[in-house]
Swiss-Prot record:
Positions of ATP binding: 6-13, 32, 116
Name of the coding gene: mnmA
Residue ranges, annotated region (Interaction with tRNA): 138-140, 293-294
UniProt KW keywords: ATP-binding, Cytoplasm, Disulfide bond, Nucleotide-binding, RNA-binding, Transferase, tRNA processing, tRNA-binding
Coiled-coil zones: none
Official protein name in the record: tRNA-specific 2-thiouridylase MnmA
Active site: 92 (nucleophile), 191 (cysteine persulfide intermediate)
Reaction catalysis annotation: S-sulfanyl-L-cysteinyl-[protein] + uridine(34) in tRNA + AH2 + ATP = 2-thiouridine(34) in tRNA + L-cysteinyl-[protein] + A + AMP + diphosphate + H(+)
InterPro entries: MnmA-like, MnmA-like_C, MnmA-like_central, MnmA-like_central_sf, Rossmann-like_a/b/a_fold
Length: 342
């Protein structure tokens, strides 16, 4: 089978390509220019080229920087301006990697596209679904909720049945040169955030703009440094007059540049809604597990679809729900889709 492999210049994607090559597939390496500086791109492309030369496969470089900026990066900035906590990876996957890059791979005659994501594809009744990775500590299925069946059927995740701790030893044994590659330290969560998301925002908007902090009764009880520096659940970085116990951000008013704070129990919710839904065609209202944050423990809830809006009712209090984050629905370890929390 002819498969396109997205190569980042790192160990995981290189080993993904190696494992597919060992299985006898015909491969085409693809490097995506999305966000980094030209200096970084040059290094990553050099690393990807070394992997391709080792494997005896071609490498194509696709420049999607303009597309990424308008569809992902700018949306990230806009969401924070609106007082939300965005999830850019959940946008990038369907639009860039499994959108534009997949389209290009198909034009090259490839049947599928592979990446170093920690996830799996499982076919149930001849329909393809995303399944959580074997290594639950590294599982990335949360970021793939917006993919449709037809796209999922064209995906390959070679690392899905492996543990993260085993990848590097396996990769270095198979491809010894990987241990000598120069690289840059990247953010663990968002690829284009090098230090903190606040530093990224400062390049484009006024972040440090002092405002007031109110309690749930609407009384002014303190000050903050600028609403974009806070997310729901944060308990530091603002000043409360005479505070004797911890306070948590429970609300953000972007238009007024105000924070609302309360006690930990005030973060609890028993319901939430999500828009821009992307649920599998056979979805039926019922009891499921949901995640409202990456790495959060799945919570049991009743999930229903009403007028294109996902409505969730929790069995137990659920804490720290932030607008803009992805709400993702699972049946056991099978991903059924999700939406954006409103």
């Amino acid at each position: 089978m002819k498969i396109a492999v997205l190569l980042s210049g790192g160990v995981d994607s290189s080993y993904s390509a190696y494992s597919l090559k060992e299985q006898g597939h015909e491969l085409v390496g693809i490097y995506l220019k999305l966000h980094a500086s030209e200096k970084k791109h040059d290094l990553y492309i050099k690393n990807a080229q070394k992997a391709c030369e080792f494997l005896g496969i071609p490498l194509e470089v696709l420049d999607f920087q303009k597309d990424f900026k308008s569809a992902v990066y700018d949306e990230f900035i806009n969401a924070y301006e609106e007082g939300q906590t965005p999830n850019p990876c959940a946008l990038c996957n369907p639009l860039m990697k499994f959108g534009l890059a997949l389209d290009h791979a198909l034009k090259l005659g490839c049947e599928k596209i592979a990446t170093g994501h920690y996830a799996r594809v499982k076919e149930i009744d001849k329909i393809s679904y995303i399944q959580e990775a074997l290594d639950k500590t590294k599982d990335q299925s949360y970021f793939l909720y917006a993919l449709e069946h037809e796209v999922i059927a064209k995906l390959v995740f070679p690392l899905g049945d492996l543990l993260k701790k085993d990848i590097k030893p396996l990769a270095l044994n198979a491809m010894p040169f990987l241990g000598t590659l120069e690289t840059y330290k990247e953010s663990q969560e968002i690829c284009f955030v090098e230090k903190s998301y606040i530093d990224t925002l400062k390049k484009h908007v006024e972040v440090e703009k002092e405002g007031v902090v109110k309690n749930l009764q609407g009384e002014v009880i303190g000050t903050h440094k600028g609403y974009m520096q806070y997310t729901i659940g944060k308990r530091k970085g603002f000043s409360i007059k005479g505070a004797l116990e911890p306070h948590f951000v429970v609300g953000i008013d972007a238009k007024k540049n105000e924070l609302v704070v309360g006690k930990k129990e005030d973060l609890a919710t028993h319901s939430l809604k999500a828009k821009n839904k992307s649920l599998m065609k056979d979805f039926k209202d019922g009891e499921y597990f949901i995640k409202a944050r990456y790495r959060s423990v799945p919570a049991k809830a009743h999930v229903s679809l009403k007028d294109e809006v996902i409505e969730v009712g929790f069995k137990e209090p659920f804490y720290g729900v932030a607008k803009g984050q992805a709400l993702v629905v699972y049946k056991d370890d099978i991903l059924l889709g999700g939406g954006v929390i409103v």
